[in-house]
């Protein structure tokens, strides 16, 4: 118990020291570049009403769908330990077929073309 308390105290102390140093060091040498906000490549001082690329939005949504596919298919190897492993294989196959049909549809509609 004593070892746990001392390691928690040491961790808290090191975290506080690092947080203090992280806030203290940038204030030693401020300049315009360090004090300006950074917004992922966008100019934060410009107009907020810039048009958003619909193509980029579509590619981002497709990425999220295929990322979700990986999350759904990740436990598939453990599905073989069920009483009826064919059910997990059926669900995985149906997910893959559905996403493949959606990808083919987007491809035929030209949604994957970045520039026309």
From Swiss-Prot:
GO terms for cellular component: mitochondrial membrane; NADH dehydrogenase complex. Gene3D superfamilies: NADH:ubiquinone/plastoquinone oxidoreductase, chain 3. It is a multi-pass membrane protein. Core subunit of the mitochondrial membrane respiratory chain NADH dehydrogenase (Complex I) that is believed to belong to the minimal assembly required for catalysis. Complex I functions in the transfer of electrons from NADH to the respiratory chain. The immediate electron acceptor for the enzyme is believed to be ubiquinone. GO terms for molecular function: NADH dehydrogenase (ubiquinone) activity. It comes from Squalus acanthias. The chain crosses the membrane at residues 8-28, 56-76, 87-107. This is NADH-ubiquinone oxidoreductase chain 3.
């Amino acid at each position: 118990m004593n070892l746990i308390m001392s390691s928690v105290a040491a961790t808290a102390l090191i975290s506080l020291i690092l947080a203090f140093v992280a806030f203290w060091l940038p204030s030693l040498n401020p300049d315009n570049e360090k004090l300006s906000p950074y917004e992922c490549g966008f100019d934060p001082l410009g107009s907020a009403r810039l048009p958003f690329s619909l193509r980029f939005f579509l590619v981002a949504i497709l990425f999220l769908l295929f990322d979700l596919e990986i999350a759904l298919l990740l436990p598939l190897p453990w599905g073989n330990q069920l009483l009826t492993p064919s059910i997990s294989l059926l669900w995985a196959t149906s997910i893959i077929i559905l996403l493949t049909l959606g990808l083919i549809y987007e491809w035929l509609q030209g949604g994957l073309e970045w520039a026309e």
